[in-house]
Amino acid sequence: MLLLDFLRSKGFSRGILSSMKPYKGAIQLNGERGFGKSVLHAGNFLRIHIPETESSENILPVKMDLSILYEDEDLLVINKPADMPVHPSIGNYDNTLANGAAWYFKEKGQTFVYRCINRLDRDTTGAHILAKNPYSAAVLSAQMKQRQIRRTYLAIVQGITPSHGTINAPIGRTDGSTIERQIDPVNGERAVTHYERLAAYALHAGTFSPVSDAQKTDFLQAYSLIELHLETGRTHQIRVHMKHIGHPLPGDFLYNPDYSIIKRQPLHSYQLEFTHPVTKEVMCITAPVPEDFSNAFH
């Protein structure tokens, strides 16, 4: 097999390979410079170095205390806090996860290009993957596109949901809004969410208590703790889908601004399962549940 064909089969795009051409040591075959037409044989030693000399220009490094869930030379998984966008936007150039990551890499003397794999909303917490190089970004992005990254979320929603269910309802942009989304059967994009109820709580004499299926009735104030898996990844998908079936997330400033038990939407990226882009090891990264989420019923 030719070296070029081998690299393409492993996920190296034309863009990545082109960026490596000026560097003589980028591809080494048995200790010598490798070329696209070099022939690979069993037992050969192939070393790949992807040079990166410049950081993202428009991301200001800002010192932050980042909670690192996992890190190696190819990827970084951060436990994202609430009230923090993942990247800068108009009006917010310095209080984002990207700013904190830029500082983190600057302190380590490393270049930083922001490569976000799974985007999270401003008030959504939990596991968030950053790719450290173009190759790991390409492989992980392909996994995301092909639905090979299993994303498990936890959420608190109003009311007592069915024990489990699947929501298959297209989502599109709300007319007149650049942010809000809605169910749009005509122009919306396919969106599928699977959920399972883990627990239910109802207000009794001023205190929240667990509710069993046998006790289910019309409580004045009740909530469900649910686990969700996304088959697709539309903007605000969980928030829009749960509102659609009559169980919105409390504390959601866009879709249900009820702040009686929590001051932001209780949505948490709890677990990510994926194949490591280089080692091919099956990874399972879990993010601890934040305090305001776990204390919502206390």
Regions found by a protein language model. Name each.
Residues 1-298:
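RNA pseudouridine synthases
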